[in-house]
Structure formats: structure tokens, C-alpha cells
């Protein structure tokens, strides 16, 4: 191990540490960070060299953050990244600084961005918040209105998690939806992601995603938002149902086939007669 450490440059050590951090399971960032910190044994090198990994993790995970003075949480995503550690809260029309290591928001300030699609964004956000409240007890959503390639675009992000460290499991749901505001009809593009880690007496992870495409009729803001939510609800329900059914099928077939019904002797052990078996005698003499 000592020879290996001598062969690795600081750059290589940081690269390896960054990979561990970026792939940390949901809810386990601090544990992975602390382990990597012990392995690297150089806090300055870790903070400076792996800072991009801290940021990438929060962006990828749609990390929710509470801003002092504001009721609703906002998601940390690439769509709200204003650069220099600042992020946008489109609902409250503010920007704030975000510490990617501490996961804390500070210095909220008014932010008025030019957004011709604000009325559309607001309508979608209102409808999406109602949907999230109904379907995700711990859910958070953030809706952006941006101009992409000259087209007004709505981007809706949803995050919901359950962290149960005492029960040895953590999980997170993420979904991202986009559509451009064009006359008559437009295409809705979405991606749904599930990540779950179970680690009691083992180490099992579920990492799954599904891409979605559908057409959306564009009329006025309110009606379009309602139709958009119908697409979101149908797709997310179908995906979650499919995941559950697949696990049931695996339990009934794949996993069952892996389990041995009888010992190698093809005979069940009569535990009341264990002493008459050779193994029982060996245990007595041990």
C-alpha cells in the first residue's frame, strides 16, 4: 500500500477521491467525504482539488436547500447555476450563494432576470407544486423559464428523498422535464431517475433511469400547464409501477432460483435430532 501511495501523484489521488464523492449514494455524501478525507490525509488538497466534485454531486442530485426568510426549498441544478457559486430561486426571484460542501444557502438578494415566459413558468410551477404535494410527501420542485436556442423553454425539476440511515437504506427520486413554448403543439422531453442504497449485512444499489418523450398541446398558460401535468403524472406512475412489478418478478423467479430449497444432502435437518448427526457430535467435542 505504501508503494502504491508513493507512485500516485497528488493529481491522481484527487481524481480518485473526486470519483468516490461524485458517486456517493444519496444521503451519504458526508460519510463518503469523511472516508475519502482519511484516505487522502490532506484537507487542503481535498478541498481545492475536489471542489468541482462537491458541486457536481449537488447539481446531479438536485440537492434541495432552505433559504433563510423563505418558506419553500429550492433545488440546486445546472439550470439555476448563475456562476461563481450563485444560484437562482425563480419562484422568489432571488439569487443566493451556495456552499457545496456545507450545503448551505447564504446572502439572498433580489434577482430580476429577463424572462418573457414568466407567466408560463408561473402557471407550470403552480400546477407542478400541487402535483408534487399530492404524490411526493417530501418532494421539492423548481421550475425555470429560459431562452434556449432562441426559444422560450420551460424546465421543471422534481426531487424527493427518504434517508433512513438507522434502517440502513437511503433513496432519492429525480425527474426533469422540458418543453418549448411553440404554437399549437410541442414536444415534452423528460428523464426519470431512481437511486436506492441498501446496506444492512450487504451492499445493494438500485440505479435506474428512463427517458420520456410525448407531445403537448399548447393553448393558454393555465390549460397547457394542466395538460403538461397529465403527461408527467402518467409517465411517473407508469415508471414507478414498472419498477415495483420488476422487483416482484425478480423475487418470484430470479432470486428464488438462486436459493437452495434443500441442503446439499437433499434432506432437511431435524434440529431435534441434531446430536445424532455427525455435525452435532463434532460441535459437542469442540
UniProtKB/Swiss-Prot annotation:
PANTHER family: F-ACTIN-CAPPING PROTEIN SUBUNIT ALPHA, F-ACTIN-CAPPING PROTEIN SUBUNIT ALPHA-2. Keywords: Acetylation, Actin capping, Actin-binding, Phosphoprotein. This is F-actin-capping protein subunit alpha-2. The modification N-acetylalanine is found at residue 2. InterPro entries: CapZ_alpha, CapZ_alpha/beta, CapZ_alpha/beta_2, CapZ_alpha_1, F-actin_cap_asu_CS. GO terms for cellular component: cortical cytoskeleton; F-actin capping protein complex. GO terms for biological process: actin cytoskeleton organization; barbed-end actin filament capping. The lineage of its organism: Eukaryota, Metazoa, Chordata, Craniata, Vertebrata.
